[in-house]
């Protein structure tokens, strides 16, 4: 890959600048960047033939309004040549994610999707929800559109197949069945209520169910019930009858169940008023595993094929694509996108725009959902903009804030202290930009709320000053809301003055004398506190912001506290990660038992080599 960079800051912007680059380009594939007079990237694009693509921009006419504006602002260009067009597409999407150019389509929601994992690193496999890298041993099923969709399916699997969901440590410590056994959601393998062979059969049935082979599962259960009845094992027959009934209820409660589509993502885009909604339905094993809507950033003039092509490349950047992707509109480069996705999946991925039949109905359903989601979002956005304008008026800001950061701390007498930051703006809560701060300084141990707030804001703004000192991105806040009164406001003022940040307004939100919601007092530096009318929509808006920050901080504190409670000496041993820790605890039952074990006993644990066993033994015995 070659990098040819040219700086055009001293030449005029527009067609003349672009024309000047043509003589330096050949017909190689690659990626180009268009920069403005301040060297900010306006646009990143790919090309099969760089010279041909750039010559299109050099034409004085025939461009959409969006492209014409971009050309007028272009002061310089940068080029990267690649070996193939597929490589250029991959590089283009990586640069778009990294640089976030103003004129590109950008997918803003990059959250991972949950899966169901049947973990098989234990004689009695465990059923659980899983996110992230598929590094654990077992069978994965997904993706599901949301945690709620996974939880519903897990609940169904427990009802029908009676699989355990407890941790290995809990499993090993049980001496009698838990409540899940009593309510017929688990077969209690922890205390030997089900033989290993029978439990393995339950696991097999659950896997067949998740693979869409429900008819076979139902037939197997019916055969077992008949056999139990003939053998006069009436209690077992009744239990099997209940499982068949539960399975029938599960099948009837499932929504979209396409017969002719075993595995696909159905993706539709709706474009209106310069905004876009992309709706994705996940179909696996002939079942719909939920849907998710996305609102990519698009410039005025962007069209459906461009939006879908950018979405596909960015969405599947860290997700395995299914065998088939059904689209509402054709993309500009279907062969290229299909090749890229096939390379990522390690198998053939087909793109299609169905015109009739069941597949077309699935796409139409996704398109209808995209249309309705965008209408709701536009209505919510109008309300949000009115609230932001009201906030600016109430707090005497120069303009309606586009980025509000709200801060809160959470701890119990200084233990497991955490600071939380949430972000809100015209599009509502921006959850992908929420942050947690583990309190490192003495303020946490002392339970000093003012000191904690100083630490959190110091870390936040020192990073901003380091990464974006000229404030060229939208990472800088227009308003800070702090949970607290005059003391917190003084602490914030002190730290911002020390950092030289004197133009970011901040407000302290205190609950007032009675500490009742609705009687909040607002504090600004050097001014007496003031209040808003009880029925003022802005007051409710600020309460929502404060409560969300409180929820986020408390959640972070609880997670940190839970982690501290579950910590064991095994966490301190070099080379013992999560998988080895699970294996050791499952084998020995407790960290104390691991500490007492000899090297031969440790070697008997799966994944523990003789060298690692010696290291573990030496750690506990001081050798």
UniProtKB/Swiss-Prot annotation:
Location in the cell: Cytoplasm
Major localisation: cytoplasm
CDD domains: GIY-YIG_UvrC_Cho (cd10434)
GO molecular function (one): excinuclease ABC activity
Entry keyword Nucleotide-binding: no
Record Gene3D superfamilies: 5' to 3' exonuclease, C-terminal subdomain, GIY-YIG endonuclease, UVR domain, UvrC, RNAse H endonuclease domain
Family of this protein: Belongs to the UvrC family.
UniProt protein name: UvrABC system protein C
Organism encoding this protein: Cereibacter sphaeroides (strain ATCC 17023 / DSM 158 / JCM 6121 / CCUG 31486 / LMG 2827 / NBRC 12203 / NCIMB 8253 / ATH 2.4.1.) (Rhodobacter sphaeroides)
């Amino acid at each position: 890959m070659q990098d040819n960079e040219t700086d055009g800051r001293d030449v005029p912007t527009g067609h003349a600048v672009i024309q000047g680059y043509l003589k330096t380009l050949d017909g190689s594939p690659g990626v180009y960047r268009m920069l403005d007079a301040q060297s900010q990237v306006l646009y990143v694009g790919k090309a099969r033939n760089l010279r041909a693509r750039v010559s299109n921009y050099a034409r004085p006419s025939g461009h959409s309004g969006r492209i014409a504006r971009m050309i007028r602002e272009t002061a310089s260009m940068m080029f990267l040549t690649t070996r193939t067009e597929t490589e250029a597409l991959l590089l283009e999407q990586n640069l778009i994610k990294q640089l976030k150019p103003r004129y590109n389509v950008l997918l803003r929601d990059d959250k991972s999707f949950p899966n169901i994992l049947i973990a098989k690193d234990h004689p009695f496999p465990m059923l659980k929800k899983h996110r992230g890298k598929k590094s654990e041993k077992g069978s994965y099923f997904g993706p599901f559109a949301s945690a709620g969709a996974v939880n519903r399916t897990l609940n169904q699997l427990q009802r029908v197949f009676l699989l355990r969901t407890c941790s290995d440590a809990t499993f090993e410590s049980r001496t009698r069945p838990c409540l899940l056994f009593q309510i017929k959601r688990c077969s209690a393998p922890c205390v030997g209520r089900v033989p290993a062979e029978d439990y393995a059969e339950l696991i097999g049935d659950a896997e067949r169910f998740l693979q869409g082979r429900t008819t076979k599962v139902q037939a197997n259960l019916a055969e077992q019930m008949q056999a139990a009845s003939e053998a006069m094992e009436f209690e077992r027959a009744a239990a099997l009858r209940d499982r068949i009934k539960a399975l029938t209820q599960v099948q009837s409660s499932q929504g979209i169940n396409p017969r002719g589509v075993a595995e696909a993502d159905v993706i539709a885009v709706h474009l209106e008023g310069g905004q876009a909604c992309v709706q994705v339905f996940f179909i696996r094993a002939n079942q719909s595993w939920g849907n998710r809507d996305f609102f990519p950033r698009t410039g005025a003039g962007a069209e459906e094929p461009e939006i879908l092509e950018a979405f596909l490349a960015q969405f599947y950047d860290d997700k395995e694509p299914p065998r088939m992707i059904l689209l509402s509109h054709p993309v500009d480069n279907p062969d290229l996108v299909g090749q890229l996705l096939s390379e990522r999946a390690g198998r053939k991925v087909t793109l299609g725009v169905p015109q009739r039949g069941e597949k077309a109905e699935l796409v139409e359903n996704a398109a209808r959902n995209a249309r309705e989601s965008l209408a709701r979002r536009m209505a919510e956005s109008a309300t949000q903009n009115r609230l932001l304008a009201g906030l600016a008026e109430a707090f005497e800001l120069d303009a309606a804030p586009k980025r509000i950061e709200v801060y809160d701390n959470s701890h119990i007498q200084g233990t497991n202290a955490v600071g939380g930051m949430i972000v809100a703006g015209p599009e509502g809560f921006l959850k992908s930009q929420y942050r947690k701060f583990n309190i490192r300084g003495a303020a946490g141990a002392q339970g000093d709320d003012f000191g904690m707030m100083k630490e959190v804001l110091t870390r936040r703004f020192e990073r901003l000053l380091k990464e974006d000192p000229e404030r060229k991105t939208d990472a800088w806040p227009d308003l800070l809301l702090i949970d607290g009164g005059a003391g917190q406001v003084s602490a914030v003022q002190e730290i911002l003055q020390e950092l030289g940040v004197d133009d970011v307004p901040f407000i302290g939100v205190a609950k007032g004398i009675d500490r009742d919601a609705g009687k909040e007092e607002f504090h600004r530096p050097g001014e007496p506190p003031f209040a808003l009318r009880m029925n003022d929509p802005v007051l409710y808006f600020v309460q929502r912001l404060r409560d969300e920050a409180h929820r986020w901080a408390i959640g972070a504190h609880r997670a940190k506290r839970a982690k501290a409670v579950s910590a064991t000496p095994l966490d301190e041993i070099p080379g013992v990660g999560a998988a080895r820790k699970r294996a050791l605890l499952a084998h020995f039952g407790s960290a104390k038992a691991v500490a007492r074990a000899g090297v031969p006993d440790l070697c008997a644990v799966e994944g523990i080599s003789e060298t690692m066993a010696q290291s573990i033994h030496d750690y506990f015995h001081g050798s």
